Amino acid sequence: MGMLEARELLCERDERTLFSGLSFTLNAGEWVQITGSNGAGKTTLLRLLTGLSRPDAGEVLWQGQPLHQVRDSYHQNLLWIGHQPGIKTRLTALENLHFYHRDGDTAQCLEALAQAGLAGFDDIPVNQLSAGQQRRVALARLWLTRATLWILDEPFTAIDVNGVDRLTQRMAQHTEQGGIVILTTHQPLNVAESKIRRISLTQTRAA
């Protein structure tokens, strides 16, 4: 039994099948990239895995239990960052981290912002930051969260090369510590091919 399992997932949109019969099992320490052309259903699959959407058929299981039966405990173990940063634009960068991680002290939050490339931006309202900086505020949570499972939709959007490298290193560290990372990205990952498992939506089934 894996930590996260998809069984025979079917997803249809506007009378079109995005994917069907999609099954896979993820274990501790796996780093997974969902691949496929635009419109193949990558974001849709991520939303199914977070429990935000339901498949037309099939099911997603966490530690052997259907998501709808373990929703609370699952979400305690999940960090989801989608296309939109999901941050409070009227709050400062530091206030956002305190909002999402109430048990994190100020020093930890400041260090997370520094790791995300936002040292010195902690007291600036998010609505005054650029799109890339707002993205970094959301991604700073990667240095604070205790969640086992990270699901990230295009995390490198509007992030410069140094930022991408730093985020990639953080993901590698998380998987080395037994966490799971699932992401979509159009950018090549600067890590050994052996570290990345790819699940393609151009095919209907994945092992």
Curated annotation (Swiss-Prot):
The keyword ATP-binding applies. InterPro entries: AAA+_ATPase (IPR003593), ABC_transporter-like_ATP-bd (IPR003439), ABC_transporter-like_CS (IPR017871), ABC_transptr_haem_export_CcmA (IPR005895), P-loop_NTPase (IPR027417). Its EC number is 7.6.2.5. PROSITE patterns: ABC_TRANSPORTER_1, ABC_TRANSPORTER_2, CCMA. GO terms for cellular component: plasma membrane. ATP binds at residues 36-43. Keywords: ATP-binding, Cell inner membrane, Cell membrane, Cytochrome c-type biogenesis, Membrane, Nucleotide-binding, Translocase, Transport. It is a peripheral membrane protein. CDD domains: ABC_CcmA_heme_exporter. It is found in: Cell inner membrane. It catalyses: heme b(in) + ATP + H2O = heme b(out) + ADP + phosphate + H(+). It comes from the Bacteria. Residues 4-207 form the ABC transporter domain. Coiled coil: none annotated. GO terms for biological process: cytochrome complex assembly. One of its GO terms (molecular function) is ATP binding. Part of the ABC transporter complex CcmAB involved in the biogenesis of c-type cytochromes; once thought to export heme, this seems not to be the case, but its exact role is uncertain. Responsible for energy coupling to the transport system. The complex is composed of two ATP-binding proteins (CcmA) and two transmembrane proteins (CcmB). PANTHER family: ABC TRANSPORTER I FAMILY MEMBER 1 (PTHR43499:SF1). Belongs to the ABC transporter superfamily. CcmA exporter (TC 3.A.1.107) family. This is Cytochrome c biogenesis ATP-binding export protein CcmA. It comes from Shigella sonnei (strain Ss046). The lineage of its organism: Bacteria, Pseudomonadati, Pseudomonadota, Gammaproteobacteria, Enterobacterales. The gene is ccmA.
